[in-house]
Amino acid sequence: MAKEQVQAITKMEEDFAQWYTDIVKKAELVDYSSVKGCMILRPYGYALWENMQKVMDEKLKATGHENVYMPMFIPESLLQKEKDHVEGFAPEVAWVTHGGDEKLAERLCIRPTSETLFCEHFSKIVQSYNDLPKLYNQWCSVVRWEKTTRPFLRTTEFLWQEGHTIHETAEESQAETLNILNLYASFCEDYLAIPVIKGQKTEKEKFAGAKATYTIESLMHDGKALQTGTSHNFGTNFSEAFDIKFLDRTGKWQYVHQTSWGVSTRMIGGLIMVHGDNNGLVMPPKVAPVQVVIVPIAQHKEGVLAKAIELQGHIQKVARVKIDASNKTPGWKFNEYEMKGIPIRLEVGPKDIEKNQVVLVRRDTKEKEFISMDQLEERIPALLEEIHNSLFNKAKVFRDENTYSVTNFEEMKKIADEKQGFIKAMWCGELACEEKLKEEVGVSSRCMPFEQEHLADECVCCGKEAKQMVYWGKAY
């Protein structure tokens, strides 16, 4: 059994896609369902999502947002109201045409996202500026009929959080859009240990129907980018289409200013590809379902299991801890919990008990140390923080070492062909250049970062005057 567990993971250097698939299966995060592209979230995978959800939910509620729930079905006529929006999602929509044996008078779309439902609701409940703002959030699943699927990264159905807010002024909606983006960025960095780049999407890459889309972008271990979260400012695009008006402070009718934003289980895919290694997952401690696992050595000997249980009682005051008292061998257990990425492993056997110590092993560095049992309650929280910082710094160094600055087309093509990572280059703002870089270099615009750099005066593609620096890259 242990041997099978060890040989199950393909090395990431040999086949990154297979390495990823091996991990999500062997670490028992997901299983495949009988419907193509739909995944079964197993207890370990769902516990990870619950921890992420709990943090995010608390942060949203602390900033005045309320949870609601909308239906999963959207009438076709409602979806058609915002032209750009429906065109953007049309290829991915799943339709319900029958109720039992009876054909429906109107097709129902299974929500790919819920803007239209929120808009219809807002149009009914808002009368005056006194009704604003409305700050709503929804936890749900959505369906997008993807052609190519991979667990967490791109699935037919996935879990997410989608926020929808309406405001009195353009300034308020813009502030909300950026505040949420900052919330997402701090969540990624402070809880998932994933460094992100904040910026704005180009017109080509923005959300269908949005006035502006902002994004956080992360770099995976194979050098590809992952759009980890987005925040959209709709302006009045949707409120005009759905007639969401209010009486302002002067008694005039105005359209509300609107935002939408979301993150999903795709973040779990990012977590795997940023921190994982050839032995399996490496869990960021703050969201790890189990932070400490205790493995009794020679547990059949008197006092060993009792001591492990006693230690668990102390540690559970400061961390999420479990004991594996199964009859599997210690070697099997070591491999199993390495695969699952549990941040800290404690080994305790008869000799350790004699010396009042345990063997502590870090998952991220494999470092072993002997530590007094009396120090565990104090040492473990500090070590979990240390592991988080180490993971973040390692990921940041990797990103920085795989970010390249170029000033001309040939240089950009050479880097894209020979390296993996982000490419920083100046851009004129023209769609034709963006499309040429996609076709001939194989990179898409990831974002126009808030932290701009002046690398050159000319566009990397056409040589005309550049307007901004853009991060480019291959992406999931």
Swiss-Prot record:
SUPFAM superfamilies linked: C-terminal domain of ProRS, Class II aaRS ABD-related, Class II aaRS and biotin synthetases
Localisation: Cytoplasm
Reactions the enzyme catalyzes: tRNA(Pro) + L-proline + ATP = L-prolyl-tRNA(Pro) + AMP + diphosphate
Disulphide connectivity of cysteines: none
GO molecular function, one term: catalytic activity, acting on a protein
Any one GO BP annotation for this protein: prolyl-tRNA aminoacylation
Entries under Pfam families matching the protein: HGTP_anticodon (PF03129), ProRS-C_1 (PF09180), tRNA-synt_2b (PF00587)
The EC number(s) this enzyme carries: 6.1.1.15
Domain notes: Consists of three domains: the N-terminal catalytic domain, the anticodon-binding domain and the C-terminal extension.
Family per similarity comment: Belongs to the class-II aminoacyl-tRNA synthetase family. ProS type 3 subfamily.
Protein name according to UniProt: Proline--tRNA ligase 2
Species this chain originates from: Bacillus cereus (strain ZK / E33L)
